[in-house]
Amino acid sequence: MDQCFDIAIVGGGINGCGIARDAAGRGWSVILCEKDDLAAGTSSWSTKLIHGGLRYLENYEFRLVREALSEREVLWSIAPHIIRPLRFVLPHRKGLRPAWMLRLGLFLYDHIGGRKRLAGTRTLDLTTDPAGLPLQPGKFRLGFEYSDCRVDDARLVVLNARDAADRGAEICCRTQVERAERSSGVWTIQLRDVISGKRRTAQAKALVNAAGPWVEDVRSRCVGLPARAHTRLVQGSHIVVRKLFDHDRAYILQNPDGRIVFAIPYERDFTLIGTTDRDFEGDPAKASATPEEVDYLCRAVSESFGDKNEDPETTELELRASWSPIGENMAGHISAWCDVLCLAAGLPPAGVTSLPGPGV
């Protein structure tokens, strides 16, 4: 316990590993503790996209979308070997968002974030474009195509951790934080190796809680602070089915309930479909897609793909896999990325900074 780290980070997801890399790159001493493996939780259960959040434009979250799109360009330039462009087809569905609204939203999406290399939006005639072939005949005539990026989410986490370690950070997997106490401006942190059971102590000037859906557990059990009433867990489930189309573009489908559902080419022979959005209570480690969520996603794609004469309730998709990331929403808003930025200008006070999990 001779060394007192500048920053101790709890959580080995994309937030924790990203902070570790950033801090270590600035010359700060860093220790990161993850009770399981890197990206064992939400960060490997995502929709596997690097995107700006097109749907957030409807909520006038212009600053958020602009920042996300700008960071998309940065990430793509840093890791082009695991982040790749992906074209999305957005069919216009009568009775839902009007075509002018989709055009306006995609125009903003193209220009608000300083897009430099990705291809821009174009209008599609779905009666002649190959993207219209898998869709229900006669149901969709007009569509739009725009660009975002896809990513191997777990590998992105590991690469951040690897780079942080190369810059001097100590990355401790299978290491659980049991207790953290602050005295005289320094955090004393009790650690336990979950495999051997051995315990050790570390000290740090600042503590970052980046435990994702376990953030309140760390806050209350380890730090001894009261739980926050404005924190809620949100589950977004995905399913994997045999591929619904043969081309390499993805679909973003509108639902009558106002939500959107992605259908994305996945591992050559499959289609990834997601996501749902519901409140979650219980142990995040035991989260799984409910029958209702599976039915919701199957109905959503069945209303767009296949024979229009089929009843969505009786159309069966061969379910190959599913996963359900649990994210944390603060007061009903999406994950507050700005909390990460407090580390950019200088070390924060010797307090605890809590970060929600990545958005779904």
Language-model segments: which ranges?
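Core beta-strand elements of the Rossmann-like FAD/NAD(P) dinucleotide-binding domain
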Residues: 3-5, 197-206
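Short hydrophobic core segments
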Residues: 10, 202-212
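Glycine-rich FAD pyrophosphate-binding loop
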Residues: 24-44
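Dinucleotide-binding Rossmann-like beta1-alpha1 core, especially the glycine-rich loop
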Residues: 48-131
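Helix-loop-beta segment of a Rossmann-like dinucleotide-binding subdomain
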Residues: 130-167, 188-191, 201-202, 276-285, ...
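C-terminal catalytic lobe of FAD-dependent flavoproteins
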Residues: 153-155, 163, 223-273, 279-360
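A conserved short coil-to-beta-strand element within the FAD-binding core of flavoproteins
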Residues: 173-187
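Flavin (primarily FAD) binding-site architecture
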Residues: 209-224
